[in-house]
Amino acid sequence: MSEQISKNNQIKDGPTLSEILRNNQRWASETKERDPAFFERSATQQHPKYLWIGCSDSRVPVSQITGTAPGEVFVHRNVANIVQAEDPSCQSVLEFAVLGLQVEHIVICGHYKCGGVHAAIQGTATGKV
C-alpha cells in the first residue's frame, strides 16, 4: 500500500485506485476460497437485525469496528450521523430498514472528535451541514 504514516501518526496519503481494485479482487478471491457459497448467499435477500446510522468519516468502518460480516448490519452514513425528517435519503433508509428488512434495532453512533459535530457546535458549518 502507498499509505505512509507521518511523525504525528497521521496518514499522509492512501492507496491508489489500482491498489483499491487489486485489494477488492484479492478479497473476493480469498472470500470465495474460504466460503465458496458466500457470493451466492449474499445475492439473496439480506436479513440484518440492525440499522446503523453513523458518520461518513473514513476512519470509522462499520464492519471492522463492530466485528460484523456483510449482511449483518444495514448501514446509513452521513456527516455527523444526522437524522432529519426532511432528508429523503435517511428517510428512505429508515423506511426500508424498518418496513422492508424488519430490523430489530436502530443504532445511531457517533465517534470521538467528529469534525461534523464540531462544526455544528462551533457554528462554522457551511451549506446544509
Where do the language-model regions lie?
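Short HxH-centered metal-ligating active-site micro-motif
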Residues: 2-3, 7, 64, 69-129
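Short, conserved "active-site rim" segments that organize catalytic pockets and cofactor/ligand binding
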Residues: 2-84, 88
